[in-house]
Amino acid sequence: LAILWPFVVVTLGKKRIRESLRSVRRLWPKLAVIALFNYLHQLFLVAGIYRVYPTVAALLEETGILFSVGLAYLVFHDERETIRRLMFQMGIALSLVGVFLTITGGQSLEGGEFNLGALYMILSALAWSLFSIFIRLWIPAVPSALATTTVFTIATPLFFITHILSGAGSVIPQAPPKMWLLLTISGLVGIGTGYTMYYKSLPALGVTFASSIGLLIPLFTSIISFLILGELLLPIQAVGGVLLLTGCYMVIRVRFKTAPSGRLKRPSGI
């Protein structure tokens, strides 16, 4: 936050930041709801990862696409045409098969149980889907960088309170300087930049399309792990990657055939 707020002020400029902050003051109850679902997503995600096998956790996290598509169909009339298309449904199915192959890499899933950890992962996926729905519903006019920073400003005290109540030890854990540097860089790139771009994309792309493209994350993770960490990329993962890319391409084609004008309409009366 010490970096994000100065960045927002510098990039928006004095005049625009004043106008945008007025919008934030009007929308703060809705931003608080968005921050709450962001907090719940992160809380359930971490709790789930500690309780199930990483492969199972990654697969369960991808159930978010099912929640996102279902909720988008119920809430946004302009996304229903996309969801009804056979090519979209085939693309999603192909992408999910690709995700499964990419994540498992042919490894056995024996030993993984549908226990409390699995429930946490599914709740995390549901919280993320609701988080996405509310972003598109409520804050399309707020600059994405300001929206990201405001939501994190609201959510951060919740994380501190949870940490203290859980009795997990010092609020500031002991770690070497290199670890803190790595955490800072990953936070700025992965959270600051990633969330800002996600906020910016939702009003233009819609929840359904943005969630579908999110299925590429396991593939990118496998590729980066191979390039940077030297982790083995198995042939079955490569096949999964091809299926995933093909499925996402089909989804993209459908999205821009059904909504070629770019920015999607906001539902009326919400």
Positions of PLM-derived features:
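Specific alpha-helical transmembrane segments that line the substrate/conduction pathway
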Residues: 2, 46-80, 124, 207-226
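Hydrophobic/aromatic residues within transmembrane alpha-helices
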Residues: 32, 48, 74-80, 138, ...
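C-terminal-most transmembrane helix of multi-pass membrane proteins
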Residues: 10, 78-79, 179-181, 214-270
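Helix-helix packing/entry segments at the starts of transmembrane helices
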Residues: 57-63, 134-157, 187-227
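Hydrophobic alpha-helical transmembrane segments of multi-pass integral membrane proteins
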Residues: 1-11, 67, 87-98, 116-123, ...
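Hydrophobic transmembrane alpha-helices of multi-pass small-molecule transport proteins
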Residues: 68-73, 84-106, 215, 224, ...
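Membrane-interface helix termini and inter-helical loops of multi-pass transporters
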Residues: 18-19, 47-50, 103-116, 164-182, ...
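Specific transmembrane alpha-helical segments of multi-pass solute transporters/efflux pumps
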Residues: 9-61, 101, 187-205
